[in-house]
Amino acid sequence: MSRADPGKNSEPSESKMSLELRPTAPSDLGRSNEAFQDEDLERQNTPGNSTVRNRVVQSGEQGHAKQDDRQITIEQEPLGNKEDPEDDSEDEHQKGFLERKYDTICEFCRKHRVVLRSTIWAVLLTGFLALVIAACAINFHRALPLFVITLVTIFFVIWDHLMAKYEQRIDDFLSPGRRLLDRHWFWLKWVVWSSLILAIILWLSLDTAKLGQQNLVSFGGLIMYLILLFLFSKHPTRVYWRPVFWGIGLQFLLGLLILRTRPGFVAFDWMGRQVQTFLGYTDTGARFVFGEKYTDHFFAFKILPIVVFFSTVMSMLYYLGLMQWIIRKVGWLMLVTMGSSPIESVVAAGNIFIGQTESPLLVQPYLPHVTKSELHTIMTAGFATIAGSVLGAYISFGVSSTHLLTASVMSAPAALAVAKLFWPETEKPKITLKSAMKMENGDSRNLLEAASQGASSSIPLVANIAANLIAFLALLSFVNSALSWFGSMFNYPELSFELICSYIFMPFSFMMGVDWQDSFMVAKLIGYKTFFNEFVAYDHLSKLINLRKAAGPKFVNGVQQYMSIRSETIATYALCGFANFGSLGIVIGGLTSIAPSRKRDIASGAMRALIAGTIACFMTACIAGILSDTPVDINCHHVLENGRVLSNTTEVVSCCQNLFNSTVAKGPNDVVPGGNFSLYALKSCCNLLKPPTLNCNWIPNKL
């Protein structure tokens, strides 16, 4: 480093960067070696014998150097020692023929890379479309799923291209209609809402006449939950009703499409079966690792590997950008319809596919700046939905995959509706649409690394599931033993945790539309889910489903063994969420680690979010109860005990079959009908059906 001449004194001022080239004097080191000796520069100042010193200085006024200026000196090789440019050209000419051709090809590809890339994609797309057409020509019914997926993909690709290129033009084209709608929306919205309400009332009246009154009970339960949310709202006078009504409306439309229309039901049923088939491939890895008898330890070696496999697939889809694309589309739909903020929409859409601790990572940079209502909505969305990684585990329990998939989709708008009613927005959101919709593709460098990271990241989840089940089931056994011991002091040893929950949650389960005799059983399942976790609840539900499928007696020693199909369906929707006290700690810890500055707000709103998430699941179950076309259980006592001659109708046959299955016959004159039926009803069924499983001659003639 060299400094300016101290004799030159100039005042400090802002200076410009300058590059000064000047010859340097030869050093003693150069004179000691004859090969590097130079003539004195004053006597011979030729470019070939001089060195160039580049010095970058900060120049002052009139180019004078300052005392405190810093100068950087870079010594370069003498010009005379540089290789002649002719040598470079000679090396260039010495390249081989193949190397020159390779360089030519690379240069051509660089110049025409856009055209080449477009050509390759066009060839691949043409080949794929040719395969789709050929598959449809061979067997259209078999190729229908591929055809539909192809059409949907092409539609969204074209849509994204048009929106990216002509979004402003489309917006300008539609702006006159939007302005016209805004001018008349004040009175038009009342016409729209009144028409919708009248249509719902008319539809419910006709549907109730067709399927029974239980569907009407589900509608009453939906209204009851909305009233409760409004009464206990954080700011009941500040409720913005658009997201509430639109959330329930989207729930209803999705449920109507899936549960009542044949194309929708067939599509989701097909998706459910494909998911089950896809999850079945987990058995190959489990069999290789744990051996042929891996099913002997069903949960550890059959269920938990599904979580690993599903986590791997989700990580790969996230690397490819497909998950982010789907989340953006679903979030955009909820944003434009419900009027929710971009942050809320993205997180609610993300919770359909990923867990309650992963979805906030989609908007991690914005969490310190969200409002309290938005933070409450983020937590509510996590409690009201389940993760895709555990969805496969619930399906493997034997729970309907169609209903689980439907519940996962319907719960997203329900969470937004409940959250905005239970904690209305009183501040102005700071995050815009474009900033919230930006999502990263992860830190994986290739697809295999993404798969490996997905499998590795599932290890804590699998360990957490296994550890929690061991702890909670052991705790449940202890609590039941303690309650039984306490109840025995009052001559009631039947006291248990399930019994207490059945009375606490029975009104809620009944108002969802569950049959009265099944409401206590569903209430027990809700208790398992709320105080332990949904794994315990779905495990008990799967046992009830298996007992029904086994067609055993519905009552054994006066104890009901299983539920109706309608009650199972409603219970599936009510349990489909992470709303439990175990998840409460997970959410508080996870969000606090992401946004430490919001720790106080997270802790204060978590309990309300847990309640809101639970009610969101209940409202989804109410929608399922309204739209479910599964016939409710027949009042068999009214059918069989009315004293009339029985006719061979579907209702009578069903009631008689249930009566035969629940009857205990030990011998002549020793027959006990099940379900509190009389011997008269049993005799009437015997005269009608002549069952092979029961000796009707054992029934006493004198009744």
Curated annotation (Swiss-Prot):
It is a multi-pass membrane protein. One of its GO terms (molecular function) is pyrimidine- and adenosine-specific:sodium symporter activity. Residues 1-93 are annotated as: Disordered. Residues 1-117, 165-188, 235-242, 321-344, 364-376, 424-458, 593-605 are cytoplasmic. Residues 1-19, 63-72 have a biased composition (Basic and acidic residues). GO terms for cellular component: brush border membrane; plasma membrane. It catalyses: thymidine(out) + 2 Na(+)(out) = thymidine(in) + 2 Na(+)(in); cytidine(out) + 2 Na(+)(out) = cytidine(in) + 2 Na(+)(in); uridine(out) + 2 Na(+)(out) = uridine(in) + 2 Na(+)(in); adenosine(out) + 2 Na(+)(out) = adenosine(in) + 2 Na(+)(in). Keywords: Cell membrane, Membrane, Symport, Transmembrane, Transmembrane helix, Transport. The keyword Membrane applies. One of its GO terms (biological process) is pyrimidine nucleoside transport. InterPro entries: C_nuclsd_transpt, C_nuclsd_transpt_met_bac, CNT_C_dom, CNT_N_dom, Gate_dom. It is found in: Cell membrane. It holds the Pfam family Nucleos_tra2_C. Residues 345-363, 523-542 dip into the membrane without crossing it. Residues 44-61 have a biased composition (Polar residues). Residues 139-143, 210-212, 263-299, 400-401, 485-522, 543-581, 629-703 are extracellular. Sodium-dependent, pyrimidine- and purine-selective. Involved in the homeostasis of endogenous nucleosides. Exhibits the transport characteristics of the nucleoside transport system cib or N3 subtype (N3/cib) (with marked transport of both thymidine and inosine). Employs a 2:1 sodium/nucleoside ratio. Also able to transport gemcitabine, 3'-azido-3'-deoxythymidine (AZT), ribavirin and 3-deazauridine. Belongs to the concentrative nucleoside transporter (CNT) (TC 2.A.41) family. Homotrimer. This is Solute carrier family 28 member 3. It comes from Mus musculus (Mouse).
